[in-house]
Amino acid sequence: MDSDSGMSGRLVKAPENFLHPDGVRQVFAEAKKGRRDFIRAAFAAAGAGAGAGAAAPLASAASNPVAPDGGDPNILELPEHSKGLGQPVVTDGYGKPSKYEGNVQRRQSPGLTQTTQASVSFAPLQSLFGIVTPSGLHFERHHQGWWDIDPSKHRLMINGSDDQIVKTPRVFTMDELMRLPSVSRFHFIECGANTGMEWGNVAVPTCQYTHGMLSCSEFTGVPLRTLFEMCGVDYKRGRFVLGEGADGSSMTRTVPMELVESGEVIVAYGQNGEMLRPEQGYPLRLVVPGVQGVSWIKYLRRIEVGDQPYGAKDEAIHYMDLMPGGQHRQYTSTQECKSVITTPSGGQVLLDEGFYNISGLAWSGKGKVKRVDVSVDGGRTWRTARLESPVLSKCLTRFNIDWVWDGKPALVQSRAVDETGYVQPTYKQLRAVRSTRSTYHNHAIQTWLVQESGEVKNVQLA
């Protein structure tokens, strides 16, 4: 921070709960009737109300001012927590966040699906630090709801599409898997539909809803290659892998064998130092770094090796890219280089002119992030941000850069470049190739407008 940059500015957090529960229930009811026009209008109205939702934290910030003479009562008066004993150990056998952070939650998008069992919850990226997403805030994507499966009864079967591809088909118990040599690695997971609501135009107000189908964890498990070696897989004939889940949708996805041969694919049972959460596939899930989240099969019960892609339901009907000419692009699983500024971002309010730390996240499904550039004038000029350690392959990377806000409108953007040299595109560049009728793999540059009032809005530049 430069010595002449003036006082540090104050920032009001985004009103993550700007959608009232009653309104959410109403929108879901209308969704079941197929009234998509109502859904769009409802979310637009909610977005317009986000500014009003910011009034409460803004009022809170103003209600506890520092006296002009510098006599801050929070320093001069001894607080209750400094006068006696606090809570005892093991008040909670499993620690919980502070009650003052109760607003930091996963949240759903009303009307996105007709049932909450086949829906999404979004991670509060704007409220997180570093690169690791707490397991309790990890985004959710379910196709038939989540289950808490008894690990003592769960099995993983590995077989081939014929008797020659897998010499020794096997069934593993959880105990057998957890006795094998394990690895622990940090990776991001992103739903292919992340930012999908923004293809045509601005649709949602906050970072949580634009980019919140994204999380990053340390995953622990057995490399799938190890299990294949135990089963005698013929790598020359078996060039594709099918993962199958034990949930009600029996989710199945094809994974190219070269990803398994690289040693990156993990049959995981651990996440962030503990067992997987039920919402994340407990007791077993497939971890396929760099690939869209639908391929990270949860409740993993079977793996089959074959000589051709399987064309499963969610490959032949869903998770395809609609191209401008009317054709569908299939098996586009890799998540391209992408970034988003989390502070300042939509719904937040800058209360003062002065110094701010612009912070955000960058990632690439093709390797490490090499550089992130930041612009505050809509892309006319760029400065290179600091990449914070660690910078890992196919993992979130935190970036920061100093900024002195002069109180005038600013268009804040980030642009990531990965180690292959790929540069994150603008919406104009991406739409020239993909048009606006797609759902998946939107990795365009995100723009936040900091208004003269200090309020931050989601905008798109032509």
Go through each PLM region and give its residues.
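Structured, non-membrane catalytic/scaffold regions adjacent to prosthetic-group chemistry
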Residues: 64-462
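N-terminal export signals
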Residues: 31, 37-65
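N-terminal secretory signal peptides
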Residues: 1-37
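Terminal low-complexity, poorly structured segments
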Residues: 7, 15, 54, 72-74
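Compositionally biased regions
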Residues: 4-9, 61-64, 83
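General helical structural elements
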Residues: 14, 29, 36-40, 44, ...
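Acidic/proline-rich low-complexity IDRs
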Residues: 10, 18, 57, 75-77, ...
